[in-house]
Amino acid sequence: MTMTDPLGDMLTRIRNGASRRKSSVSTPASKLRARVLDVLQSEGYIRGYSVVDFGNGKSELSIELKYYEGASVIREIGRVSKPGRRVYVSVKSIPQVANGLGITILSTPKGVMADHQAREQNVGGEVLCSVF
């Protein structure tokens, strides 16, 4: 059976793993998922991730979750643009999460990036998810 929202599935695995205090979670690999994880890592929401290759054309991303004083660094993580309803924004209307304490991750013509990077580069795009 095919998955209709692979990115949403990855975000749900991260959310569930953090609520169960798992040290790491795994998800099937894709370029988009890896780019989103790059942003989460650079912004300090995860420790890191690694690609596990099974050799038959299948690979998996192992995501190391981050905790501070026993609590997950990620309080909320959710999908904004969904397969049935895509959300596109211009640079002027990029949403702020928790008055700038969280981030919005966008897919832009210049790549996947956080909201503050998109504002600096003056590009809009599809709002993938928000993290706080």
Swiss-Prot record:
One of its GO terms (cellular component) is ribonucleoprotein complex. One of its GO terms (biological process) is translation. Keywords: Ribonucleoprotein, Ribosomal protein, RNA-binding, rRNA-binding. GO terms for molecular function: rRNA binding; structural constituent of ribosome. Coiled coil: none annotated. PROSITE patterns: RIBOSOMAL_S8. It comes from the Bacteria. InterPro entries: Ribosomal_uS8, Ribosomal_uS8_CS, Ribosomal_uS8_sf. Signal peptide: none annotated. Part of the 30S ribosomal subunit. Contacts proteins S5 and S12. One of the primary rRNA binding proteins, it binds directly to 16S rRNA central domain where it helps coordinate assembly of the platform of the 30S subunit. Belongs to the universal ribosomal protein uS8 family. This is Small ribosomal subunit protein uS8. It comes from Rhizobium leguminosarum bv. trifolii (strain WSM2304). The lineage of its organism: Bacteria, Pseudomonadati, Pseudomonadota, Alphaproteobacteria, Hyphomicrobiales. The gene is rpsH.
